[in-house]
Amino acid sequence: MKRTYQPHNKRRKRTHGFLVRMRTRGGRKVLKRRRLKGRKRLAV
């Protein structure tokens, strides 16, 4: 059986990258929460 995680850097950036997060309202909320939490990395 094929495993679910097949890593690809391009897809990783395109779906979870900073610019993608900034594009939507929800994504900006994610970044805001991560800033408040004090995350070292806000996005991939």
Swiss-Prot record:
GO cellular component, one term: ribonucleoprotein complex
Key words, A-Z: Ribonucleoprotein, Ribosomal protein
Recorded GO MF terms: structural constituent of ribosome
GO biological process: translation
Gene3D superfamilies assigned: 1.10.287.3980
Protein family: Belongs to the bacterial ribosomal protein bL34 family.
NCBIfam families in the cross-refs: rpmH_bact (TIGR01030)
Name used for this protein in its record: Large ribosomal subunit protein bL34
Gene: rpmH
